[in-house]
Amino acid sequence: MKITSDVFEAYLKCPTKCWLRATGETFAGNIYSEWVKAQNDSYRESETRRLVAEFPNNEVAVSPDMKNLKAAKWRLASSLAVQAQIDSRALESGLHALERVPAEGRAKPTQFIPIRFVFTNKLSKDDKLLLAFDAFALSKSLGREVRIGRIVHGDEHTTLKVKTSAMSSEVRKRVERIATLLSMRG
């Protein structure tokens, strides 16, 4: 069973929607939700371009291989597919962007900061939980804790730093509930 960021997001809104998304059901077409998705996709695209422009070309990677993440030389990556296994559950998240902060000393590991783009000016708890899900999947994939993440949002490109490690237990509970839901109905 695979729990993706789309399935996780659907669960935050409604367990039935989660079930439908996980089983591949097609949706009848909610005009508002389609508009919100289009706005978020457009915002993600433009903010990714803006963020990439802030880094030298040799420090940016698009869809890098996750196998060599710890040894990577880039400082910013976009469009990263993260996969991890927890018990019998597969987690999969499409990171909007990932910043790699090199270690300051030999004893400290390189820090990875997931970045999520949200077009709205006001963030919801769900936005923070989605970032925490990204960080949770990334931490399981790397085998180490991802403590913080960032959300870039709104007209002013406001950046919010989120302590994702503080939200990991809530993400784990939701992942377990999703797994239970999908196994009961499947």
What do the predicted segments below correspond to?
Residues I86-E176:
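Nucleic-acid nuclease catalytic cores
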Residues R177-G186:
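Polybasic (Lys/Arg-rich)
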